[in-house]
Amino acid sequence: MEERFYQPPLMVDYRGKGCLMVSYFFFDSNHKRIVILLSLMHNIERMVLMNLIIEGHSITPRPDTSLFTMVQELGLFSGKLSSDPIVAKIAGRVFTLNYVPVRSKDLAPERGSIRKAMAASDGTVELIRYDSPIGRDAYTRTAQFVMFYSLYRLWPRAKAQMACTIGASLYVKVTNCPEFDVEKFKEEVQKTANENFPLHRRRITIQEAMDYYNATAQEDKARLLSYRKKRTLDVYEKDDFCDYFYGEMAPTTGFLRSWDILPAEEGFIFVFPDMNNPDRVSTYKEMPNFFNVYNEGKRWGALMECETIADLNELTESGKIRELIRVNEALHEKRFSAVADMVCERGARVVLLAGPSSSGKTTSANRLATQLRTHGKKPILMSLDDYYIDRDKILPGPDGKVDLEHINTLDTALFSEQLQQLLLGQEVEIPTFNFKKGKREWIGHKMRLEDSSIIIMEGIHALNPQLLPENLDANLIFRIYASPLIPLNMDDHNRINTSFLRLLRRTVRDFESRGSSVENTLDMWPSVRRGEEKWIFPYQENADVIFNTSTLYELAVIKKFIYPLLLKVEPGDECYDQVRSMVKVLNYITEADVEDEIPPTSIVREFIGGNTFYRKD
């Protein structure tokens, strides 16, 4: 499979001549890097006239002047996280503010200068702040560097492992450091932030990086780098500390503002800024149910010797991934059986199943229904989607836009009334929502619960308390929150976000089942995420059970389906930079051709196809 990349043009001063460089490069089937370089020579005056537009200001960049300096000179920094730019976006590409658009030194032989291209047909530079997901990701990477560097300064032999996010906080595990002291560590982090030193990258060879990480007992990083196709790596350095991440960071450590560090078992909690008011620290909320389920996944990963991407790759290459699949699927079945036991022991008549997009809710509902049947129950699968009100009756919000994720798009009064009637043994006619027409229809779908009937109601708002009638017997309701809480890390300092896995799942599913393009899925994703933050995540701790729908093996399987789709995205597309980031991670993963081992009722089948729950024959 040919892997092709396009690098936008870079204007440089090459030996006294303005030089516009454009390059294409790709990997052939043997992963050999082939570069085609086109160099168009112009005089130096052309370079000088290349202007940038930064928030309405036209700037002629001076040689060797960074975007950071330009933004400073424009007076766009206030010292507040809410208003200060963190990174920049140019022609769909995200850049560090330390990026230098025009350099005076001889850069022609340096491939890195081509990769870091200054590409904008009109020169527009979009400044990205904390209110953007891109800005928050850059802040997170900056926080990681500051934390790990500070830990290294205090206790050089200590090991830190990125664990999981808990609301607006991050749990980091610390090992090999019996003397670890949270307060002392917090002071050191503040000291590093106050030093406000620049965060510059340096390009080194993969061998240099592997030698460094092996010498500093960071075998997790060295093992991962052995799967990297490129011969070089961009690292961040300070003194004798060296680390790398998968994206841009803030220009200096001083951008780490509005944070806190709290003690935690075997480590600490880093509390991020408030998303709605970044100039203050968010309130840390303990989530014991979520935390316990995540730790259970980590324990299983350790037992299966699959805690990192390098572990997964080795299992794929050895063929042992088949055993991993069998154990994962057996574990899921065991959990569904246990949940069915709990539902029946309580005497619940209604199961409410919620979770964020691409969590595998539909397959989970069907597999739970199968287990309930082994108890002699008659499960009835329903969807909250059928209780949507007509689209033309949805009122816009204060911003004038219609929020289709809002709970007010559901007829909660009708749902509450019909639920009460069903539990009283009455017959009701259930509505059917016609998504093509955007209207509710009544097609004679009547329902009455038998003594052995159990409703399984799936929907993003299923855990919202507004759904249920008052004074309802709590024992009649059983709540489940489903989410793929993947326990795999790239390495100790780089975790794989649950949202990343869900985006991979959704991209493949939307293409396979709906014919939706990568561009369309990625364009909708920010809106989906905002809806989840507002309407799903706040209620997850209300669940009686949190069900982890991830599997340790699925990244190796799903790569086969998503990789070709991502490579079709062109450089000029708005989502190109996001696709590059996704490809960057997938490049480390060894593809596994083991579909014949995946059961037809697997949650993974909901996304790659072949799930027999959806057969019509």
Name every feature range the model reports, one short phrase each.
Residues 86-87, 91, 102-110, 116-138, ...:
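Auxiliary tRNA-acceptor-end handling modules of aminoacyl-tRNA synthetases
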Residues 361:
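Conserved lysine of the Walker
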Residues 394-435:
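Conserved nucleotide-sensing/catalytic segment adjacent to the nucleotide-binding pocket
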Residues 353:
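Hydrophobic anchor at the beta1->P-loop junction of P-loop NTPases
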Residues 358:
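Walker A (P-loop) phosphate-binding loop of P-loop NTPases
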Residues 468-617:
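Conserved NTP phosphate-binding and transfer environment spanning the P-loop NTPase/kinase superfamily
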Residues 375-391:
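Short beta-strand-centered segment that lines the nucleotide-binding/catalytic pocket of NTP-utilizing
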